[in-house]
């Protein structure tokens, strides 16, 4: 069984695409469509890494990131977002210390390589 990745995004098409790409590469994929759903699932089962969108209703990715990091300090976390401004990348990578910052649209090969690097495959 491959490494387990949690994908959190409020857009079902994005979740389905990322899930398909990662499962094709042998990863097991957990999904959540909101920050609250992600936190509930994390309490039951811990993945090897989490990929999360930034722009989500109710709890955005920045807030979700902080909540996950508080409780699961060593869990690799990456932002998966359309927000490609330098200020967003700086906040994600250097202020919050995300393990990666992946912008949409992303290439299949690039996504897989970056996830493998995060989980050390």
Give the positions of each predicted feature.
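Conserved phosphotransfer cores of two-component systems
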Residues: 43-45, 68-74, 96
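C-terminal output helix
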Residues: 105-116
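Acidic catalytic/metal-coordinating carboxylates
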Residues: 34-37, 60-64
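Two-component/phosphorelay signaling modules centered on CheY-like receiver
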Residues: 12-30
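Receiver (REC) domain active-site loop signature in two-component systems and cognate sites
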Residues: 56
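Active-site beta3 strand of CheY-like receiver
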Residues: 45-51
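Alpha4 helix (beta4-alpha4-beta5 surface) of REC/receiver domains from two-component response regulators
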Residues: 63, 84-100, 113
């Amino acid at each position: 069984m491959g490494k387990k990745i949690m994908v959190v995004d409020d857009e079902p098409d994005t979740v389905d695409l990322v899930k398909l790409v990662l499962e094709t590469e042998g990863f097991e994929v957990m999904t959540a469509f909101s920050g609250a759903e992600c936190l509930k699932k994390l309490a039951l089962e811990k993945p090897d890494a989490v990929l999360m969108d930034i722009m989500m209703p109710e709890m955005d990715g920045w807030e979700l990131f902080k909540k996950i990091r508080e409780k699961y300090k060593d869990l690799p976390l990456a932002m998966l977002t359309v927000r490609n401004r330098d200020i967003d990348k700086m906040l994600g990578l250097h202020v919050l210390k995300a393990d990666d910052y992946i912008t949409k649209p992303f290439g299949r090969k690039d996504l897989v390589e970056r996830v493998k690097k995060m989980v050390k495959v």
